[in-house]
Amino acid sequence: MKTRPSVKPICERCKVIKRRGKVMVICSNPKHKQKQG
């Protein structure tokens, strides 16, 4: 899980979702997981 100021989808399987007011990227590739914070 990477925490960065701006989250962007890296590949076509990345999904941008909002959880508890935080923007997150979830993907089948665990390296692509990101959260904003």
Curated annotation (Swiss-Prot):
Q: Which GO terms describe its biological process?
A: translation
Check the record and name the InterPro entries matching this protein. Ribosomal_bL36 (IPR000473), Ribosomal_bL36_sp (IPR035977)
What Gene Ontology cellular-component terms does the record carry?
cytoplasm; ribonucleoprotein complex; ribosome
Q: Mind listing the UniProt keywords for this protein, alphabetically?
A: Ribonucleoprotein, Ribosomal protein
**Which GO molecular function annotations are given, in alphabetical order?**
structural constituent of ribosome
Q: Which domain of life is it from?
A: Bacteria
Q: Which PANTHER family match?
A: 50S RIBOSOMAL PROTEIN L36, CHLOROPLASTIC, LARGE RIBOSOMAL SUBUNIT PROTEIN BL36C
Q: What NCBIfam families does the record point to?
A: rpmJ_bact
Q: Which family does it belong to?
A: Belongs to the bacterial ribosomal protein bL36 family.
From the Swiss-Prot or TrEMBL record, give the protein name. Large ribosomal subunit protein bL36
The organism is Natranaerobius thermophilus (strain ATCC BAA-1301 / DSM 18059 / JW/NM-WN-LF)
Gene name in the database record? rpmJ
